[in-house]
Amino acid sequence: MIEKRPISNLIGHLMLIIGIIIVVFPIYYTFVASSMSSVEIIRPPMPLVPGTRLAENYSEALSGGVERVVGVSLERLLFNTFVVAIAIAVGKIVISFLSAFAIVFFRFPLRMAFFWMIFITLMLPVEVRILPTYKVIVDLGLIDTYAGLTLPLMASATATFLFRQFFLTIPGELVEAARIDNAGPFRFMRDILLPLSKTNIAALFVILFIYGWTQYLWPLLVTNDSRMNTIIIGLRKMVDFTDASTPWNYVMVTAILAIIPPVAVVVLMQRWFVKGLVETEK
């Protein structure tokens, strides 16, 4: 029987409320700012209640306001970012799943050496890898293309490692039963591994989608054409060094719209995400 401790419960709830405020307040503040004019935003103190320009700001931003500032429409920025995030998430999962499948279930020379080569890349800083990768993309003529934005970010040593660890927990009897049933590698992967891995895949998809959605450095390097910019690059271009020349109302509108897709993915896949993390820990 769990002993009830009112003081402990009170402290726990208080810490939870403080944490929620710390996380939610900046988002609320951004939403309030998106309902005001630029002059109202930069004039301190800014009110904490929504202004009167909410519908007007969003309508203007979506109907050409952002395009006049950065040279590309807000819809295009969102579309580019969505394509990049989906391609990176799906690409990482597919490549990592197949890599881990080959390492665990196939017997070939130097297979563990290949695994450690993949694993060692976790220790390499991004700065070490980014310049050689950029040179390859330039030589292949993939600047200002979706392939250039996504292909170099699809390989994932972390996801490969997680899939490998999960595959190692699969009982040998299950593998042996598949062999007795004359199940080939593709059938074994399709009928056994994929159903068992669906929660892990869902958890990884959420994490990798957010990773792809928030990319800044790589899109900054490989996009010169504003039509290929992502939402994060668009936000950076909107912000000038002087407050007076920055369209803060459009910046706040864009920031709110940039938050919605990742939040929607987390909310819609929350049950699978939590279940996948718990099963990964096991």
UniProtKB/Swiss-Prot annotation:
Question: What is the designated name of this protein?
Answer: sn-glycerol-3-phosphate transport system permease protein UgpE
UniProt xrefs under InterPro entries: MetI-like, MetI-like_sf
Which part of the chain is the ABC transmembrane type-1 domain?
A: 78-269
Q: Where is this protein localized, as stated in its record? A: Cell inner membrane
Matching Pfam families: BPD_transp_1
The way this protein sits in the membrane is described as:
Multi-pass membrane protein
Q: What is its main location?
A: membrane
Q: What does this protein do?
A: Part of the ABC transporter complex UgpBAEC involved in sn-glycerol-3-phosphate (G3P) import. Probably responsible for the translocation of the substrate across the membrane.
> Which keywords does UniProt give here?
Cell inner membrane, Cell membrane, Membrane, Plasmid, Transmembrane, Transmembrane helix, Transport
**Transmembrane segment boundaries:** 14-34, 86-106, 112-132, 136-156, 201-221, 248-268
Name the protein family. Answer: Belongs to the binding-protein-dependent transport system permease family.
- Gene that this polypeptide is encoded by: ugpE
UniProt subunit comment: The complex is composed of two ATP-binding proteins (UgpC), two transmembrane proteins (UgpA and UgpE) and a solute-binding protein (UgpB).
Biological process per Gene Ontology, one example term: transmembrane transport
